[in-house]
């Protein structure tokens, strides 16, 4: 089987992934990380791009918030976040898109300033080297919180007690959350465990053969599970994925 895999990770923020014109979303990233860690596959290239074109404070704050959805999978031996700045050269896809005033922000290069002035004059610096822009200070906050997750261990268990499904979450081996998951919530977790699911398919599955349940109940259950960081989905309930693994069923 596979021992190591490289994949396009790039960000924990849906908006940033769109700004970088990526075809994947954060739900895809969760799915990939979840099952790679389950099967012991190393992910050495979980690169997080900082300084992306169009990046805003709110995007970095979303990245910080979304770190918690991956809390069970931080393992420096398997899955490590690498924060790297976006670098632009004249053959980069973004180079032609950026107006000159925006390109001026990309002025950081370790070598260019060492060149003699005579060499630099009249030369398109982007033809010689790639450059990055100054980093937003919020990335330092992201880095510190990211390190916190790697320095501590989250775990969980799912059990059945008197016919009830009980979810227990621990932080550094100490229980911190105990939650009864109703039949509908547990069905959602199982349906979204092994694939990224759309809202129509999930609602259809939840309503099949079940009286007294409508779409509103399903969306309310999804909201609660996301509030507890047990499922993730983007705006409009698209791309739903369970954060936890429901196989084996109880452990």
Label each residue range with its predicted role.
Residues 1-76:
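Conserved non-cysteine loop/helix-boundary elements of the Radical SAM core domain that shape
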Residues 9-16, 21, 47-50, 90-92, ...:
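Active-site proximal loops enriched in glycine and acidic residues that flank catalytic Cys/His/Asp
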Residues 38, 57-187:
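C-terminal scaffold of the Radical SAM
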